[in-house]
């Protein structure tokens, strides 16, 4: 699809948000982030992807099937939210880069993927498997809090120009409050 603006031709791919996370448990902050990302980045939809067996977290006190069902129930009334079982069905460790590759293969080149993640995840990106390849294959929307800006700046700087172009920020003031009252 082309968007003609004067003599410039701009190819407009559809934007789809992929919200990966343990959702252990899912809380209102996750839903606020998904809704804000959908609105601010003009996403066609937001696909929630509960993590399977991850290399970075070993704290799934709620089973992956129960987390999947919890997210599914929470988003069922929102027409621009959906859920994918791609990671919970994967055997062995689940890496974000593999998920994004598989989604690109399923959806085709007409979609630009915007991976929605929290501050901690984006700050840890320099340690992720195939992080450069991952950043080549999708954009990141970082749901950040003002208190975490320095860690995020360091992660963006690690990736240089590509980090500046592909890591975007989503500020939702409610998250600062929610992080203070969240009970683990």
Show which residues each predicted segment covers:
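Acidic, Ala/Val/Gly-enriched low-complexity intrinsically disordered segments
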Residues: 8-10
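N-terminal catalytic cores of NTP/NDP-binding nucleotidyl/phosphoryl-transfer enzymes
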Residues: 13-42, 46-52, 118
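Hydrophobic/aromatic beta-strand patches that form the interior of the parallel beta-sheet core
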Residues: 18, 47, 84, 114, ...
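Short, solvent-exposed loop/turn segments at secondary-structure junctions
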Residues: 23-24, 53-55, 120-122, 146-148, ...
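N-terminal Rossmann-like or analogous alpha/beta NTP/dinucleotide-binding catalytic cores
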Residues: 52-139
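Short, flexible loop segments at boundaries between secondary-structure elements
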Residues: 136-154, 163-176
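Conserved small/polar residues in nucleotide/adenosyl-binding loops
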Residues: 181-183
């Amino acid at each position: 699809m082309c968007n003609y603006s004067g003599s410039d031709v701009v190819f407009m791919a559809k934007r789809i948000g992929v919200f990966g996370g343990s959702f252990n448990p899912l809380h209102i902050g996750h839903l606020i982030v998904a809704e804000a990302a959908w609105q601010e980045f003009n996403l066609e939809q937001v696909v929630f992807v509960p993590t399977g067996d991850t290399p970075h977290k070993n704290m799934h006190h709620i089973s992956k099937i129960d987390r999947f069902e919890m997210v599914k129930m929470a988003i069922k009334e929102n027409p621009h939210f959906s859920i994918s079982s791609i990671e919970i069905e994967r055997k062995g460790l689940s890496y974000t880069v593999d998920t994004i590759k598989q989604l690109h293969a399923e959806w085709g080149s007409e979609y630009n993927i915007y991976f929605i993640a929290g501050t901690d995840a984006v700050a840890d990106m320099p340690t992720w498997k195939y992080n450069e390849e991952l950043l080549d294959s999708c954009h990141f929307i970082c749901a950040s809090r003002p208190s975490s800006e320095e860690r995020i700046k360091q992660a963006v700087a690690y990736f240089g120009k590509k980090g500046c172009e592909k890591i975007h920020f989503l500020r939702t003031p409610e998250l600062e409050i929610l992080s203070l009252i969240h009970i683990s």
